[in-house]
């Protein structure tokens, strides 16, 4: 455990980690201060930071398990001490750390007798187990246990739909994509009268997939991303001189869909429309955001080739973006999008290969 003496700056706003400890591999604690703040500022920052820590940070979980030998979720298997339901609950508790976008596959294939733990999960290189000792199942006989797993990175909660008699032996698992287990803030006031100031104390507990300091940094970045749109003045966006940045939105074929948006008779101030208003899936939104694409204008200033060059971007992501443009901004794409991307053939082949 590391604990430092709290010293307060009288000039520049500063933050500092004053205490940190790891109770075990799946429980980290950190205590931070931010000062000096004017009266009321500590509560403003503390409330928003706590919500961002608990709700805006992505985590990685096992969301589905598949085995053809399982008749239903509440069955028991010969040679395995736990029921299928117990195994699924144990898989739900596995803590993972990753740089994953979207979903990926993993597997378990173990022969008994013996214990099956998290270290037996066969993972892609960009996913790792935080605690290899986490228990999954106990094999009491020389049988083989093989389970296919789906791993997903997301935020918030994923509640499974009832699926007790899956025909293909695939069972969804409730997921809690929350690396931060708890977060609290408290305020210490000092000074008198008009010189009264505040110190904000933030306490963060994580599950080990992120350290408290990493969680604090990520929550701060997410809050900044949410507030960036307010840095663009409304008049600047809506009253552009000489129709600058006005982009036409006509009907067009899929082959030229992004390039020809600028030729529509219906013009809009696209610089004022942000991509987070467009119901984009989190994976696509995060890919665009990491490529500095924040507004619809930014999006339309990129060609199909540019979008396909974005890391982890796929041809179906481009199609999904176009579907959302059609739905939300009255862009008529015709009956069925065409697949003729001659200029993108090499890029698509290289991504699929």
Swiss-Prot record:
Coiled coil: none annotated. The keyword Nucleotidyltransferase applies. It catalyses: RNA(n) + a ribonucleoside 5'-triphosphate = RNA(n+1) + diphosphate. GO terms for molecular function: DNA binding; DNA-directed RNA polymerase activity; protein dimerization activity. GO terms for cellular component: chloroplast; DNA-directed RNA polymerase complex; mitochondrion. Its EC number is 2.7.7.6. Residues 267-353 are annotated as: Alpha C-terminal domain (alpha-CTD). CDD domains: RNAP_alpha_NTD (cd06928). Its main location: plastid. It holds the Pfam family RNA_pol_L. InterPro entries: DNA-dir_RNA_pol_insert, DNA-dir_RNA_pol_RpoA/D/Rpb3, DNA-dir_RpoA, RBP11-like, RNAP_asu_C, RNApol_insert_sf. Keywords: Chloroplast, DNA-directed RNA polymerase, Nucleotidyltransferase, Plastid, Transcription, Transferase. It is found in: Plastid, Chloroplast. Residues 1-234 are annotated as: Alpha N-terminal domain (alpha-NTD). One of its GO terms (biological process) is DNA-templated transcription. It is an enzyme of class 2 (transferase). Belongs to the RNA polymerase alpha chain family. HAMAP family: RNApol_bact_RpoA. In plastids the minimal PEP RNA polymerase catalytic core is composed of four subunits: alpha, beta, beta', and beta''. When a (nuclear-encoded) sigma factor is associated with the core the holoenzyme is formed, which can initiate transcription. The N-terminal domain is essential for RNAP assembly and basal transcription, whereas the C-terminal domain is involved in interaction with transcriptional regulators and with upstream promoter elements. DNA-dependent RNA polymerase catalyzes the transcription of DNA into RNA using the four ribonucleoside triphosphates as substrates. This is DNA-directed RNA polymerase subunit alpha.
């Amino acid at each position: 455990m590391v604990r430092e003496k709290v010293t307060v700056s009288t000039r520049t706003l500063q933050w500092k980690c004053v205490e940190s400890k790891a109770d075990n591999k799946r429980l980290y604690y950190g205590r931070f201060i931010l000062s000096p703040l004017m009266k009321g500022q500590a509560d403003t920052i503390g409330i928003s930071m706590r919500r961002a820590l608990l709700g805006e940070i992505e985590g990685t979980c096992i969301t589905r398990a598949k085995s053809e030998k399982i008749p239903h979720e509440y069955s028991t298997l010969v040679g395995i001490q736990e029921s299928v339901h117990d195994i699924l609950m144990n898989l739900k508790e596995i803590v993972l750390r990753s740089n994953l976008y979207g979903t990926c596959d993993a597997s378990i294939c173990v022969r008994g007798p013996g214990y099956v733990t998290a270290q037996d999960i066969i993972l892609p290189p960009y996913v790792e187990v935080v605690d290899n000792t986490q228990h999954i199942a106990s094999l009491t006989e020389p049988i083989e246990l093989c389970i296919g797993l789906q791993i997903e990175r997301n935020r918030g909660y994923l509640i499974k739909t009832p699926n007790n008699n899956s025909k293909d032996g695939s069972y969804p698992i409730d997921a809690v994509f929350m690396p931060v287990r708890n977060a609290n803030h408290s305020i210490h006031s000092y000074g008198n009268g008009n010189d009264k100031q505040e110190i904000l104390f933030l306490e963060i507990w994580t599950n080990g997939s992120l350290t408290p300091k990493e969680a604090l940094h990520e929550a701060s970045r997410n809050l900044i991303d949410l507030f960036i749109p307010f840095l663009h003045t409304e008049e600047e966006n809506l009253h552009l001189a000489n129709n600058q940045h006005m982009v036409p939105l006509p009907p067009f074929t899929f082959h030229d869909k992004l390039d020809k948006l600028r030729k529509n008779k219906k013009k809009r101030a696209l610089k004022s429309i942000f991509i987070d208003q467009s119901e984009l899936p989190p994976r696509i939104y995060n890919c665009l955001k990491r490529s500095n694409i924040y507004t619809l204008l930014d999006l339309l200033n990129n060609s199909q080739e540019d979008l396909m060059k974005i890391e982890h971007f796929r041809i179906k992501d481009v199609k999904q973006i176009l579907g959302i443009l059609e739905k939300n901004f009255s862009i008529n794409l015709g009956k069925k999008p065409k697949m003729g991307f001659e200029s993108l053939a090499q890029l698509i082949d290289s991504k699929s290969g």
